[in-house]
Amino acid sequence: MSLNKAVLEIRQRIKVKPSPTNEPAASWTGTDLVNGVQTKTLTVIFKSAGCRWGKAGGCTMCGYVYDCASEPPSLEDYMAQLEKAMRKAEKFPEFMVKIFTSGSFLDEQEVLPEARDAILKNLTEDPRVTKVLVETRPNYVTEENVQACLSILKNKPFELAFGLETSSDKIRRDSINKGFTFQDFVHAAETAKKYGVTVKVYLMLKPLFLSERQAMEDIIRSIDDAAPYADTISINLCNVQKGTLVEALWEKGQYRPPWLWSIIEILRQAKAAHPELPLMSDPVGAGSKRGPHNCKICSSEVADSLRTFSLTQNPADLSTADCECKELWKKVLEIEDFTYGTPILD
């Protein structure tokens, strides 16, 4: 069975409850480092017509495909979603807006151009919005739609975010089933740069079928490869989302989310190699069985140190906790490659 077929079979078994098309899938506020300054942010996950790649199977770890609308939202629906999300930032004097969907904001079959343009126009006219980021698969980036976005945003800074996950085409194909190549990303990033648009790259630590050590080596190599094209690199730590192939294998004891010690070591090495490149990681679900974790004693502290480092870029803020589980992690790195893919510890 192909990887895509395995993912698609799981998708087809999941029943998604209908939900209002005039409400975002999610929205929240936070703080990001933007041009070296800690900046308030509003993240909006728009409920869209759905990820085109996800409908055909999609990525092995992604449960966001279930966040799409039961029917394509209208222009009015999209504006209502934006209005509801913006209320969460009403007390901020200024903030950055980060736009996501269950797929790609620049896919015109997922988000109609008139809806895309209306959202950007609304944000352009709000003087509090200092920058706009949108996430998209690289194959939907064209000179035409980049120019269209810029013409609406006028002088407001614009950023494109890409879920590259890894610079390895083999891992992206055989572990993630992502459906595009590193060169697809390079072409999209170069198109963005041509028009003065900044680029954010998302990498993912420990997709399926990699040992802990292999996963660490992959991310360190991927940071080196993506650095020439990225203004910021954010490392997502794979977590176990419902209705995914990752979950199916995790339930069988054939997958363990990454150790938090792994991302600590990755960031130390990568920051030394790329001192001027902003590197960040938000350990979603840290400390839980489904999320990246060490032991119960140190997971919370180590996760907090990652969040602090993401804002300060100071390697001294990365946890140096002397926990007993650190020795276990080191032992995992030594011997896991010899256990034929079976995780040593849960």
From Swiss-Prot:
GO terms for molecular function: 4 iron, 4 sulfur cluster binding; lyase activity; metal ion binding. One of its GO terms (biological process) is tRNA wobble base 5-methoxycarbonylmethyl-2-thiouridinylation. Keywords: 4Fe-4S, Iron, Iron-sulfur, Lyase, Metal-binding, S-adenosyl-L-methionine, tRNA processing. Pfam families: Radical_SAM (PF04055). Its cofactor is [4Fe-4S] cluster. Binds 1 [4Fe-4S] cluster. The cluster is coordinated with 3 cysteines and an exchangeable S-adenosyl-L-methionine. Pathway: tRNA modification; archaeosine-tRNA biosynthesis. It is an enzyme of class 4 (lyase). InterPro entries: ELP3, Elp3/MiaA/NifB-like_rSAM, RaSEA, rSAM. It catalyses: 7-N-[(5S)-5-amino-5-carboxypentyl]formamidino-7-deazaguanosine(15) in tRNA + S-adenosyl-L-methionine = archaeosine(15) in tRNA + L-1-piperideine-6-carboxylate + 5'-deoxyadenosine + L-methionine + 2 H(+). [4Fe-4S] cluster binds at residues 51, 59, 62. It comes from the Archaea. GO terms for cellular component: cytoplasm. Changing residue 51 to A: Loss of archaeosine formation. Residues 36-276 form the Radical SAM core domain. Its EC number is 4.3.2.-. Radical SAM enzyme involved in the synthesis of archaeosine, a modified nucleoside present in the dihydrouridine loop (D-loop) of archaeal tRNAs. Catalyzes the cleavage of the C(epsilon)-N bond of the lysine moiety of q0kN15-tRNA, leading to the formation of archaeosine at position 15 in tRNAs. Forms a robust complex with the archaeosine synthase alpha subunit ArcS. This complex likely consists of an alpha(2)beta(2) heterotetrameric structure. Belongs to the radical SAM superfamily. RaSEA family. This is Archaeosine synthase subunit beta. It comes from Methanosarcina acetivorans (strain ATCC 35395 / DSM 2834 / JCM 12185 / C2A).
